[in-house]
Structure formats: C-alpha cells, structure tokens
Amino acid sequence: FLHPSMLAFDAPSREECCADRSRSNIPQQALVLLNDPTYVEAARSLAGRTLAECQGSAEERVAWAWRQVLQRLPRVEEMEAVMPLVREHLAHYRATPAAADELLKTGYAPPPSGIDKAELAAWTHVARVLLNLHETITRN
C-alpha cells in the first residue's frame, strides 16, 4: 500500500529498491500539501512551537519560524508579505472562534494546551505558507 499523498509525489512502491526517483511538479502536489490533514497538522505543530518557544513580537515569531523551516531569516520583502497575513488571520479567528476550533481539530494530535486558539489558528496559516514555499519543498 502506498499512501495517496506519496503517489502525488511520485514515490516508488516499497516492493523494490529505488536508487533514483523521478522529479515532477504538478498541481496535485500543491493540493496535497494544502489539503491533506497530515500537512495541516504539521503546520499546526510548527505554529504551536512558534508560539511556545518564541515569546517576542509577531515579527520576531515570523523570523523564528522562518529560520526553523528555511534555515535563514526572511528578507525585508518576505516579511512585508507575511505580516499582513498574520494580522488578517488573527483578526479573522478572533472574530470567528468556531472557525479556529474547526481548523484546530484537524489531525490526530491534540492542539497544545495553554495557547490562545485564535492565535494558534492564525499562526497555523502562517506555518502553512512557510511549509508550502517552493524553497521549502524543493531541495535544489
């Protein structure tokens, strides 16, 4: 059995050894990364770590998460692109707590306790952006 998300990324069957994998970039891969509960849960986990381990400002948290994912700090234009996203999603989830609850119940692992749900949901979206950057997905 090969998980459907692995099929989207051209994973070989596990029945035999494969020394070289083909590389592709197709729209279905983006859909998997954005919609598969596994990847949403991974983003939520990164968001939880960001909020728990970085007690600074929103800008400092973006920089911390960026460094965790990409091993570098964001450039000025990248920070300028992400900060409105942080504010927009935070306002949205503070206004609609039910939407935050819906997002945070995705996956098997429970959300971290002691973190504001609206904040965790907003930072989950920021983490999804970081985890879906071309630079994150591709090695070269």
PLM feature spans:
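C-terminal structured "cap/appendage" subdomains that terminate the fold
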Residues: L51-T124
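An acidic, gly/pro-interrupted, aromatic-rich
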Residues: F1-R61, A109-N140
